[in-house]
UniProtKB/Swiss-Prot annotation:
This is Galactose-3-O-sulfotransferase 4. Residues 1-18 are cytoplasmic. It is a single-pass type II membrane protein. Gene3D superfamilies: P-loop containing nucleotide triphosphate hydrolases. GO terms for molecular function: galactose 3-O-sulfotransferase activity; galactosylceramide sulfotransferase activity. Residues 40-483 are lumenal. The chain crosses the membrane at residues 19-39. It holds the Pfam family Gal-3-0_sulfotr. Residues 225-248 are annotated as: Disordered. PANTHER family: GALACTOSE-3-O-SULFOTRANSFERASE, GALACTOSE-3-O-SULFOTRANSFERASE 4. Belongs to the galactose-3-O-sulfotransferase family. InterPro entries: Gal-3-0_sulfotransfrase, P-loop_NTPase.
Length: 483
């Protein structure tokens, strides 16, 4: 993988090392989050010959596009839509994916390099490098760096734990023993310990799922019966400091965090009706600082389009590279910002939201932290500039949907007869998908298919492209002719 850069070397540190210089470490990590190149607006790569094409002419790129990418695909956070962007970008540019043998890298176990299809550690440097690692895994930095170049761009996505809990309860009700025993999400959150048993089958879906996906250790009172899996798998992970541990809820569960920036004295700030004292827990603080040193950008599902604009900026990609359709969305389960703003919630909904955040207190800490990071980055990018780019992105997406899709939107799976575009149906909710319009040109048909293909089918397509089946000739056709 070559010599590690100073930044990537720092990524190998665990919070135990951070105890020596926590303040400096957090400052550096936060600074890394704020770095980014100028955003490039370019003409659409898909020539649909419609009015959605930008009137701005193509801009000459001022930086090379980043193509070594590590995306931690978190569960029920809009990550399938990001995965679709990566699939399409890598497919168009002939990039090499680090693919699992099936569809996940041994989840829920920690990621291991040996699970990457075609990975040969003893190849002596002759193996072509991987460009993109993006399928479901439980993050394990040391093993990831065995597979990916040290200059890779690391990013992920988080979602408000209250919204995530609603989606996870519906999707994983048959998988999680805790959810399966509960008659409703409200009943579960009213008394979660009556249903939840640490270490029970699938119960990592029922509490602090984001924290789990990031591969972070759990404080003693939250550890599973199997113990903290970091201990035996990774010698340099975050570790719980001796004599330290977070209180039961480090964040006020009644504080409905409102992430919209408020200008005060010329500075953008975050508003909250209650103080969110993350500093009260060194355990949480150290883990968040470690994540800051590892991840170059963390997207926020409730601000998905804003996040995509920042992603394009950070990667030096064109706007069209991040224009796409939503994938793996459940019927009636859209990305609604009302969950993070108490203004539109009923009393019952507020109570459910507060309980979900309190139960998933580590996820709530993650969400608050990376939400603030996102808005700090937006301030640096420029609010008016961002608003313009988001409006353009949405206009292009809408034009693509009208041009490519029957009805111009996602449809109930009962209308999807083409198996290439029918999303995998799991859980109690219906997963929506797409039907392509007829009469598309060959070029437009190809691009619209890329946009509409669900993640499992696209992974299979990439697998077949990267590992084409070998055809052996029958023995009789390979015989030499008689003299």
């Amino acid at each position: 993988m070559g010599v590690l850069s100073p930044t990537r070397t720092m990524r190998l540190w665990g919070p135990r090392s951070l105890g020596v210089a926590l303040g400096v470490f957090m400052t550096i990590g936060f600074a890394l989050q704020l770095l980014g190149g100028p955003f490039q607006r370019r003409l659409p790569g898909l020539q649909l010959r419609h009015s959605w094409a930008s009137s701005l002419g193509p801009a000459a790129p001022s930086c090379p596009p980043r193509q070594h990418l590590v995306f931690l695909k978190t569960h029920k956070s809009g990550s399938s839509s990001v995965l679709s962007l990566l699939h399409r970008y890598g497919d168009r540019h002939g990039l090499r994916f680090a693919l699992p043998a099936r569809y996940q890298f041994g989840y829920p176990r920690l990621f291991q390099a040996s699970r990457v299809k075609g990975y040969r550690p003893q190849s002596g440097g002759t193996q072509p490098p991987f460009h993109i690692l993006c399928h479901h895994m439980r993050f394990n930095l040391k093993e990831v760096l065995q597979v990916m170049p040290s200059d890779s761009f690391f990013f992920s996505i988080v979602r408000d734990p209250a919204a995530l809990a609603r989606s996870a309860f519906s999707y994983y009700k048959s998988t999680s023993s805790a959810f399966r025993k509960a008659p409703s999400l409200a009943a579960f959150l009213a008394n979660p310990r009556a249903f939840y048993r640490p270490g029970a089958r699938g119960d990592h879906y029922a509490r602090n799922l984001l924290w789990f996906d990031f591969g972070l250790p759990f404080p003693p009172e939250l550890r599973t019966k199997r113990g903290n899996p970091h201990v035996s798998r990774d010698p340099n992970p975050p570790q719980l400091p001796s004599g330290a541990g977070p209180p039961a809820h480090t964040l006020d569960p009644n504080a409905l965090f409102h992430p919209v920036p408020i200008v005060a004295d010329g500075h953008s700030q975050m508003s909250s009706p209650a103080s969110l004292d993350l500093g009260s827990s060194s355990f949480i603080q150290w883990n968040l600082a470690w994540l800051d040193s590892v991840f170059d950008l963390v997207l926020v599902a409730e601000y998905f389009d804003e996040s995509l604009v920042l992603l394009a900026d950070a990667l030096c990609w064109g706007l069209d590279d991040v224009v796409g359709f939503m994938h793996n969305a459940q019927a009636g389960g859209g990305q609604d910002r009302s969950t993070i703003d108490d203004g539109g919630l009923t009393t019952e909904e507020r109570q459910l939201t507060a309980r979900a955040r309190a139960w998933n207190n580590l996820d709530w800490a993650l969400y608050v932290h990376f939400n603030r990071s996102l808005w700090a980055r937006i301030k640096q990018y420029g609010q008016s500039r961002l608003d313009s780019a988001v409006a353009e992105l949405r206009a292009r997406r809408e034009a693509l949907a009208k041009h490519c899709l029957v009805g111009g939107e996602a449809l109930d799976p009962k209308y999807i007869t083409d198996r290439r575009f029918r999303p995998f149906q799991f859980g109690s909710g219906k997963v929506l998908g797409y039907v392509l319009r007829s009469g598309l040109s060959l070029q437009d048909q190809e691009e619209c298919e890329r946009l509409a293909t669900p993640e499992l089918q696209y992974k299979d397509k990439l697998d077949a492209k990267q590992f084409p089946p070998t055809v052996s000739l029958p023995l009789k056709t390979s015989r030499r002719p008689s003299p």
